Amino acid sequence: MHVKQGSKKLLLAAAVAASSLNAHAGATINFGEDKSVSVGLGMRYSFTSAEDAAPNGKDRSSDFNLDSARLYFGASLNKYIKGMFNTEWDGDQIRVLDAAGQFAISPEFNIWAGRLLSPSDRANMAGAYYSMGGGYWPGVASRYGYNGGIFRGRDDGAVVWGNVADGKLGYSIGAFEGRTFGIGSLTQSQAKNAGVKSTDSLMYAARLQYDFWDAEPGYYGTGNYLGAKDILAIGVAGRYQKKGVLVVGDKGDYASYNVDFLMEKRFKGSGAVAFEAAYYDYDTDDVIESEQGKAYSAGLSYIFEQNVGWGRVQPFLHWQRFNPDTNIDTKQYDAGVNYVIDGYNAQISAMYSNTKVEGTRSLDKFVVAVQLQF
C-alpha cells in the first residue's frame, strides 16, 4: 500500500502521542541524532484482606505485598534500530521481563525479536500496569497471559506488526517457542526430561484490530485511556501450536482465539465513560479439560474530568467467567475506585473482589494498591 509522506508524519506523531500515555515517566539521555538511552522504574504495592486466607484457614488475612518492581531500559541506535530491556521482581529474584531488538522500518512495518509479549487479547497486551482498575488482571478469563509464557506472559520469538489505513488498522503476526501456557502442561525441556516425545513445532500468534474512532498506534496496548481518547475498537487474536500441550501419557494441539471490544467516550466538562468486553475459546485437544472451554469478561468505568485534590476519581466494575469442559465454572466480580494522580505513573486504587468456584463457597477480598512509575 502506498502511503503519502504527510500521512506517515501524522502516523508517527500519533504514535508519539499514544506512547506518552502508556509509557513510564523515565529519563532519557541523548548523545547524537536519533541516539539515546532511557531508564525508568515501575512498582506496585498493595494491602490485601482476604477471606479465610489467614494461616489458620478461617480468619481474614492482613498482608502487605510488593506485587511488582520493574526496571525499564531502552536504547536507540538510529531512527530505525532500537531495543528494550526490562526486568521484574518475581517475589524471590529479579528476572528478565522483556529483551528485544526493535526494527522500526515504518509505522506500517516493524520487526521485533527477542523476549516479549506475543500477539493476544487487549488485556494481555496492556498488562497489569495499563488496565482499567489499577493493577487489575483478568486472570479468570484471559488464561494465557500474566500466568503463562516464560515469565509474565512473555515468550521468545519474533513478531511483525504495523498500523495501516491511517493508523486505524493494526496487525501483528509472529512465531514463538510456546508450550508455556500456564495450564499445567509440560514445557519442552520438562517433556524431554520426563520422556515425553514430541515434535519441536513453534507457536504461531496473530492479532488484528480496527479503530473506528481515534487510532491506537503501537504494539503493546492500553486497557483504558483515562479520558485521553475517544475509542471504539474491536480486535481478534489467535494462537496455535501443534503438539503444544504435553503431559505424561498424552499430548495434543493447542489453539485459542478471542474477540475483544473497547468503547471509551469523552464528555466535555464532565468526564469519560468506558466499556470493555471480551470472549475467549480455549482448546487443549481434550488433554487438559480443566483449561479447555469458553471464557467471558466485561468492564465498565467512568473517570471524572475535574480533579479532587491531586487527581481524578475513576469508579469501575468488572465481571469474569470461565466455563471449562469439566463444568466447574469460575466467576469473579470486582468493584472499586481509582485515584488517578498522573495517568498510569501515579495511581491509588481500592477494590472489592468476590470469586466463586463451582462446588465451593464464594470468597471475597479487599485490596488497596499504589502504582508508581518514574
Predicted features along the sequence, with ranges:
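Short, structured loop/turn "capping" segments at alpha-beta junctions
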Residues: 216-219, 271-273
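Cleavable N-terminal export/targeting peptides
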Residues: 1-26
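Outer-membrane beta-barrel pore domains
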Residues: 2-4, 28, 32, 57-58, ...
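Outer membrane beta-barrel
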Residues: 27-54, 58-181, 198-216, 222-227, ...
